[in-house]
């Protein structure tokens, strides 16, 4: 399967990444963020929800910080499983995520921001066209959610992040940054 074309942007600081996202958004350009790429790239290969721009966080070093009180969005899952600086439960859960190859590429931020899984949506565009669209990919058009027929008010695809439940149980705070400033989600 061939990857569709897109413009890859590689900011080197968080500020550059935020500025770039703001500029793209202000000009009406759609974009995706990419961390480890273990979810996004397979979706792009299947031509699922492809955007013309992708902003990579790989060079934003401040997002790779790992300490006893801070886990950056770009910290690789395998770093958590081998770390004595994080809660043992986080290490245990990180070690259970997917395969070694996925854990070596996958990031904390990417895991938390995983797209929902849906049998109807996660198919080729041709396959989806053959059975009509679903609420997730055609939101706002009155298309039904294929998981629950005759229901078009919400998508019930399941959220698959591995780390979010354990972070919630441990009372973690998630810090977000964007063009409007910083935001902290206390005890997610």
Predicted regions and their residues:
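C-terminal structural segment of proteins
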Residues: 1-187
